[in-house]
Regions:
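N-terminal, non-cleaved signal-anchor transmembrane helix
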Residues: 1-65, 80-81, 167-190, 339-345
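Cytosolic-side transmembrane-helix boundaries in multi-pass membrane proteins
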Residues: 1-24, 30-34, 227, 234-241, ...
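Hydrophobic core segments of alpha-helical transmembrane domains in multi-pass membrane transport
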Residues: 18-34, 71-76, 96-102, 123-128, ...
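Single transmembrane alpha-helix segments in multi-pass membrane proteins
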Residues: 31-36, 46-106, 119, 123-145, ...
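Short, non-helical or kinked segments that cap or interrupt transmembrane helices
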Residues: 37-42, 79-96, 138-147, 221, ...
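Transmembrane helix-bundle core of multi-pass membrane transporters
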Residues: 144-215
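Helix-loop-helix "hairpin" substructures at the membrane interface of multi-pass membrane proteins
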Residues: 192-268, 292-293, 297
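Transmembrane alpha-helical segments in multi-pass inner-membrane proteins
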Residues: 248, 254-328
């Protein structure tokens, strides 16, 4: 009976609790808007209209959710065994940089050979960026939260150096970006929109994450480590190996998001290829309680808020910061609910 109760709690009550906490966050934002003389119904209506009022808005929700799903998975996979990977932003830039090297160096290859190569380079770039803090955690006990966060700045600044120096387009009139990628290095777009092949990367990654977590020994051992690392060590589960494995897989997915951004949306590497996707993906993962299916839902929700924020600015004259406040309140309310539950347990 106890196991049945836990199953009901995990499959029914936890999603309902998450929805309730999210709704509470929207109520809190409404109260905040009322304090400043704004109608929250109008604000939410503008967000809804911006995201769903046209085919373009709906497609942009998906476009903005793609890197969020991949970066959220980069956080969630290590988090299931108790690791905090805050390095999604740097790992995304590392994957973008590796894919850029491939596009600029191997651009003469046919599309059928070049694109798979760029995908592999993006994965390897992100994995390499995650390997450094993972190795430090395994070999020296260095806190991965600090090391991944600090490494973000190193990698982002390295991208700045490359696009202002060795990779700078000589025809850019002194703008800091690389030459445009050849057509063979660009991902496909669909349905006359900016939705690109990165969507399939994200959905496949989320599906494999879900199946591996639920139906493989690898997923079972990760969950055991996350629940009780001491018991896992006594049972002979190799903790160090899983630290390296989960961090590198997570980094690879963030790197894949970077590859998709430069090979689809930007068609070149430039500063600011990410508008904080790595950090927002971290937020998405925590909002989703590190659950693969929850990641898809929350990434789409934040995509709606991001696209709808443009309409809030136009129709109500509210600053775009209003949307950031909504996201922040959702984050704090959901995390606050989890903390309260853990304290009372």
């Amino acid at each position: 009976m106890a196991s049945v109760a836990r199953l009901v709690d995990s499959r029914v009550l936890i999603p309902l609790r998450l929805l309730g906490l999210t709704a509470l966050a929207f109520v809190a934002v409404g109260a905040f808007l009322l304090l400043f003389g704004r109608n929250p119904i109008e604000a939410y209506g503008a967000i809804f209209k911006g995201a769903f009022g046209s085919g373009y808005g709906l497609s942009e929700v998906v476009v903005r959710a793609i890197p969020l799903m991949l970066c959220a998975a980069a956080t969630a996979i290590p988090a299931r065994m108790g690791l905090l990977n805050v390095g999604g932003e740097g790992q995304l830039h590392a994957g973008a940089m590796a894919a850029t090297w491939g596009a600029l160096t191997l651009g003469a290859l046919p599309r059928g050979a070049l694109l798979p190569g760029l995908v592999i380079l993006g994965l390897l770039g992100g994995a390499a960026a995650a390997f450094v803090p993972a190795f430090l955690r395994w070999a020296a006990g260095v806190n991965e939260t600090i090391s991944t966060l600090l490494l973000n700045y190193v990698i982002v600044l390295l991208v700045e150096y490359m696009v202002r120096g060795p990779w700078k387009d000589p025809m850019s009139y002194n703008w800091p970006f690389t030459p445009e990628f050849p057509e063979s290095a660009r991902l496909s777009f669909y349905w006359g929109t900016r939705i690109h092949a990165g969507l399939w990367f994200a959905l496949v990654a989320i599906t494999l994450f879900y199946l591996a977590l639920r139906r493989t020994r690898w997923g079972y051992e990760i969950r055991v480590i996350g629940d009780n690392p001491d018991a896992a060590a006594r049972a002979g589960i190799p903790l160090g190996r899983y630290v390296l494995l989960t961090m590198c897989i997570g980094g690879a997915l963030a790197g894949l998001a970077g590859m998709a951004e430069v090979c689809a949306i930007q068609s070149r590497l430039r500063p600011g290829i990410s508008t904080g996707f790595g950090y927002t993906g971290f937020l998405v993962s925590w909002l989703a309680l590190h659950h693969p299916l929850g990641i898809v839902v929350m990434a789409l929700l934040l995509g709606v808020l991001s696209v709808g924020g443009d309409m809030v600015q136009i129709s109500l004259g509210l600053p775009y910061a209003t949307v950031n406040i909504i996201m922040a309140l959702i984050f704090f309310v959901v995390l606050g609910g989890r903390f309260r539950k853990s304290r009372s347990a």
